[in-house]
Amino acid sequence: MTQTYNADAIEVLTGLEPVRRRPGMYTDTTRPNHLGQEVIDNSVDEALAGHAKRVDVILHADQSLEVIDDGRGMPVDIHPEEGVPAVELILCRLHAGGKFSNKNYQFSGGLHGVGISVVNALSKRVEVTVRRDGQVYNIAFENGEKVQDLQVVGTCGKRNTGTSVHFWPDESFFDSPRFSVSRLMHVLKAKAVLCPGVEITFKDEVNNSEQRWCYQDGLNDYLGEAVNGLPTLPEKPFIGNFNGETEAVDWALLWLPEGGELLTESYVNLIPTMQGGTHVNGLRQGLLDAMREFCEYRNILPRGVKLSAEDIWDRCAYVLSVKMQDPQFAGQTKERLSSRQCAAFVSGVVKDAFSLWLNQNVQAAEQLAEMAIASAQRRLRAAKKVVRKKLTSGPALPGKLADCTAQDLNRTELFLVEGDSAGGSAKQARDREYQAIMPLKGKILNTWEVSSDEVLASQEVHDISVAIGIDPDSDDLSQLRYGKICILADADSDGLHIATLLCALFVRHFRALVKNGHVYVALPPLYRIDLGKEVYYALTEEEKAGVLEQLKRKKGKPNVQRFKGLGEMNPMQLRETTLDPNTRRLVQLTISDEDDQRTNAMMDMLLAKKRSEDRRNWLQEKGDLADLDV
């Protein structure tokens, strides 16, 4: 590590180099499936805009993937500012694309102009063939660099247009170089469902199989297939749609009163949102509001019973498709929608449609209401049972714990908050129904070398154990009180130290919680940036620089505030940045069987008292990677 830090030490990454250096920031590096999805999304965007009727996908025997569409064809003319063919610009330059405005596509899944260029950056070779204006063009790239100029290789009919992208993923960037065929087929089938009338084919040359999908009544047919043979309520799915100038929503849903595997899929501009988001929240809220209104109007709600979202949502199977301009996603992989206005839009549309349906189908509606009321009554009985058990047999909960009222492990969350002042703000900012808060005083004990029999001697550890309902070193999670246990510490070095000690506690003494995916670390922002009435939050210096760069195009001077700790945030800011599921950032603490030994070795080196020499050597070797507050 060099001792001098001057202008020579500053690196500027250009072209596709940022992607090749940090591929995990741009795609899922488990398998190359996400690269395939990016190319498929481009072709489907053409279908969504009404310019394509067919998309063909071929998985070749050498694990390369080819996607062919009959859309307009990528532009091949020279870009007026950059002086290179547009197709070359699209593949070689991050943030170059035709989907930033609404001139070319009303709705699209491409937002940042990085999708196809990421495919190019992480592939050994990419070949693009464009049919446009009666000519066939070809261009090729290797390792993100152009190796063959755009050239005309043939002619075709004027109406014969489209694009073919054939790419060979670079296995050095992925845990496994092989495509998951089942996931690929699931994505393609979903695209066909969401684009009624568009034909999508998949040819698998590895397993010698072919598949074709084309749905005329997309969502209804798809949901009906998924629950075929199971008793449903109603018999035929409740379907609806609404199309506005800048937003559109389609849905199909039904309930499985006797249980069964639920299909729960959501999409934004045909992009699958595996983790849901604001559109799914809006669907749930709209159904709840309509059902509450129906029950109150018909006076069928027993005294003391109030329906909650989980009562109407518990056995609901649904497919939801939202189309909107400028959607905001949590992360580049677009697995969760965070656009706040979408929740209100979907909720309002669904509430009106479901209210109408309930009053037009009274018999089925009353059966649904009975099912929801029975769920609410079970929930109330379970809550009373839990309270009675606490008073008679179990240890009293810690006094500083501000508990929640819900019991559903799919929703309940416990936040372990650094400091009393931040704990007070968090108690005001939380949703009392499903979020519990427990403040911690200072740094907890380093428990890495403490036996599980002795660890409860620490009052803080004892309180955490009682609050979550699990004994140290126990694999029995039947008494677990919260589905998510979230570590919430300051974004500075002290906060990171506390978060590390808490992670060590869970990895060493509550390993079953970690292995079952119950432990999370919240990522509070370090900066708040204000420009007029617009507010932005940044987690790191790099994010702050990115936001400021983006704001240069707007009038006014941005005001930057650095949070010294969680205690500096008011309850509204704390809710928006760290507690609200729609806008916060959580990182799940996970340990796979393969990583077990490696995780133990790393934690032991960092936390064991006898390993000080190893720590010093590690710091000398890796110290230049540290992000320090100086």
UniProtKB/Swiss-Prot annotation:
Q: Which intervals hold domain Toprim? A: 412-525
Q: Which residues bind ATP?
A: Y5, N42, D69, G110, L111, H112, G113, V114, G115, I116, K334
Subunit structure of this chain's protein? Heterotetramer composed of ParC and ParE.
The gene is: parE
**Matching PANTHER family, A to Z?**
DNA GYRASE/TOPOISOMERASE SUBUNIT B, DNA TOPOISOMERASE 4 SUBUNIT B
> Which UniProt keyword terms apply here?
ATP-binding, DNA-binding, Isomerase, Magnesium, Metal-binding, Nucleotide-binding, Topoisomerase
Picking any one GO biological process from the record gives: DNA topological change
Q: Which reactions fall under this protein's catalytic activity?
A: ATP-dependent breakage, passage and rejoining of double-stranded DNA
The note on cofactor binding and number reads: Binds two Mg(2+) per subunit. The magnesium ions form salt bridges with both the protein and the DNA. Can also accept other divalent metal cations, such as Mn(2+) or Ca(2+).
Superkingdom of origin organism: Bacteria
What is the protein name stated in its UniProt record?
A: DNA topoisomerase 4 subunit B
Q: Which family does it belong to?
A: Belongs to the type II topoisomerase family. ParE type 1 subfamily.
Alphabetized NCBIfam families for the sequence: parE_Gneg (TIGR01055)
Q: Which HAMAP family match?
A: ParE_type1
SS bond partners:
none
Residues that, per the record, bind Mg(2+) 2 = D490, D492
Positions bearing the site annotation: Interaction with DNA: K443, N446, H497, R615
Q: Which GO terms describe its molecular function?
A: ATP binding; DNA binding; DNA topoisomerase type II (double strand cut, ATP-hydrolyzing) activity; metal ion binding
